[in-house]
């Protein structure tokens, strides 16, 4: 048991939910009480004076591809010199290069490559991170990626949620045969992953260059049979009705959404599905059509913000910078950006015990060298993190 005193607490209970001169009572890894310190119930718990600093829930990065091998720096240079997508692919670049490197990496090598990325996230105030598979595209490597993700959660003071993304792309050995790939690789791998307790949700990529709505619907039906929630990469490059499809399947989230239309917005609102905005990919791909934030806001769709950390289209590992990008590029307010990396990000992962500072919630907290929550989205550069607590313990 302990008390954090002399804080400015953003509870995220109503907007920022800001409480000046606040205290938090923590016991058993959970928040027992929060409010003005003058009203703190009598307690013999040791008190830590936090010097008037800002306290928020630890941040949640709800969409990452943080486990992979290799880099895509060479094709980054190629694109800047004018190479087309086809030319990059012909030179061995694109997702195939990451798949090749990831398949060749052992579990230990994948872990060694991934831990520094996770450590950088934690230094930015992240306390929960989602990690997807999707760079194996064969049964063995997809499972290896998920095992490495679980191992990260054991080695670091971070809560890891895994998403099975076997339906990320059709590998070269199944080119032109996506249905066979789903039947022979994706669904068998999913069953093994579920049997081993490796998967928390099932994801897919609904796009002309990936999988059709009918194929995703089949995948989701199988996921539901395994009692697994679903989420979807949707409307990133075109509109195939992926968001509405996700909503029909009670998806936790639909992610990207640059080409989301009014029908999709209405479907997300009706289903309570979270819209996950990924400004890093929008920036890296130099897209020009942004997600319809005003329409999502008007419809009451909860909006989350994540890094989409991946080697090809969003090599962004700083959630604070993603918050700034969401405000600058997508016109979110700083309040929306903070909610998008706390309470709404938790909802996008199906978590109901984190993302707010309230009695009964996990004591996953971030203490910042800041006076006001808007500073977290305003800053560009190193995160002003002073300290982080994971289940009520300083880390």
From Swiss-Prot:
Keyword Translocase: no
SUPFAM superfamilies named among the record's database cross-references: Composite domain of metallo-dependent hydrolases, Metallo-dependent hydrolases
Catalytic activities: 4-imidazolone-5-propanoate + H2O = N-formimidoyl-L-glutamate
EC number per UniProt: 3.5.2.7
Pathway of action: Amino-acid degradation; L-histidine degradation into L-glutamate; N-formimidoyl-L-glutamate from L-histidine: step 3/3
Keyword Cytoplasm recorded: yes
Primary localization: cytoplasm
Binding site for 4-imidazolone-5-propanoate: 72, 135, 168, 236, 313
Residues the entry annotates as binding Zn(2+): 63, 65, 233, 308
GO cellular component, one term: cytoplasm
Co-factor binding comment: Binds 1 zinc or iron ion per subunit.
Cross-referenced Pfam families: Amidohydro_1 (PF01979)
Cofactor list: Zn(2+); Fe(3+)
InterPro entries in alphabetical order: Amidohydro-rel (IPR006680), HutI (IPR005920), Metal-dep_hydrolase_composite (IPR011059), Metal_Hydrolase (IPR032466)
EC main group: hydrolase
Cellular localisation: Cytoplasm
GO biological process: L-histidine catabolic process to glutamate and formamide; L-histidine catabolic process to glutamate and formate
Binding site residues for N-formimidoyl-L-glutamate: 135, 310, 312
One GO molecular-function entry: iron ion binding
Keyword terms of this UniProt record: Cytoplasm, Histidine metabolism, Hydrolase, Iron, Metal-binding, Zinc
Residue numbers binding Fe(3+): 63, 65, 233, 308
Sequence similarity: Belongs to the metallo-dependent hydrolases superfamily. HutI family.
Protein function: Catalyzes the hydrolytic cleavage of the carbon-nitrogen bond in imidazolone-5-propanoate to yield N-formimidoyl-L-glutamate. It is the third step in the universal histidine degradation pathway.
Protein name: Imidazolonepropionase
Species for this entry: Cereibacter sphaeroides (strain ATCC 17029 / ATH 2.4.9) (Rhodobacter sphaeroides)
Gene name linked to the record: hutI
């Amino acid at each position: 048991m302990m008390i954090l005193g002399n804080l400015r607490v953003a509870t995220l209970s109503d907007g920022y939910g800001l409480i000046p001169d606040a205290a938090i009572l923590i016991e058993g890894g959970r928040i027992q009480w929060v409010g003005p310190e003058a009203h703190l119930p009598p307690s013999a718990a040791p008190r830590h004076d936090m010097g008037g600093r800002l306290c928020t829930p630890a941040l949640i990065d709800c969409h990452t591809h943080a486990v992979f091998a290799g880099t895509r720096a060479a094709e980054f240079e190629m694109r800047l010199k004018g190479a087309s997508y086809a030319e990059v692919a012909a030179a061995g670049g694109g997702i195939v290069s990451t798949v090749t490197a990831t398949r060749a990496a052992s579990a230990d090598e994948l872990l060694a490559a991934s831990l520094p990325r996770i450590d950088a996230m934690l230094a930015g105030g992240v306390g929960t991170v989602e990690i997807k598979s999707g760079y194996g595209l064969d049964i063995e490597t997809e499972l290896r990626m998920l095992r490495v993700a679980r191992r990260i959660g054991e080695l670091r003071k971070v809560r890891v949620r895994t998403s099975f993304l076997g339906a990320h792309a059709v590998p070269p050995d199944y080119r032109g045969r996506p249905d066979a790939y789903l039947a022979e690789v994706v669904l068998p791998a999913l069953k093994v992953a579920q049997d081993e307790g490796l998967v928390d949700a099932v994801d897919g990529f609904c796009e002309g260059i990936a999988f059709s709505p009918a194929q995703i619907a089949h995948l989701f039906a199988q996921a539901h049979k395994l009692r697994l929630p679903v989420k979807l990469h949707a409307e990133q490059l075109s509109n195939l009705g992926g968001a509405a499809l996700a909503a029909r399947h009670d998806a936790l989230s639909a992610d990207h959404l640059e080409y989301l239309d009014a029908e999709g917005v209405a479907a997300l609102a009706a289903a309570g599905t979270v819209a996950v905005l990924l400004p890093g990919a929008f920036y890296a791909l130099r897209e020009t059509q942004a997600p319809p934030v005003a329409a999502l806001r008007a419809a009451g769709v909860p909006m989350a913000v994540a890094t989409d950390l991946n080697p090809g289209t969003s090599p962004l590992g700083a959630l604070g910078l993603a918050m700034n990008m969401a405000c600058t590029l997508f016109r979110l307010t700083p309040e929306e950006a903070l909610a998008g990396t706390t309470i709404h990000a938790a909802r996008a992962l199906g978590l109901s015990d984190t993302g707010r500072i309230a009695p009964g919630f996990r004591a996953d907290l971030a203490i910042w060298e800041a006076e006001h929550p808007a500073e977290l989205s305003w800053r560009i550069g190193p995160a002003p993190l002073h300290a982080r607590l994971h289940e009520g313990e300083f880390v």
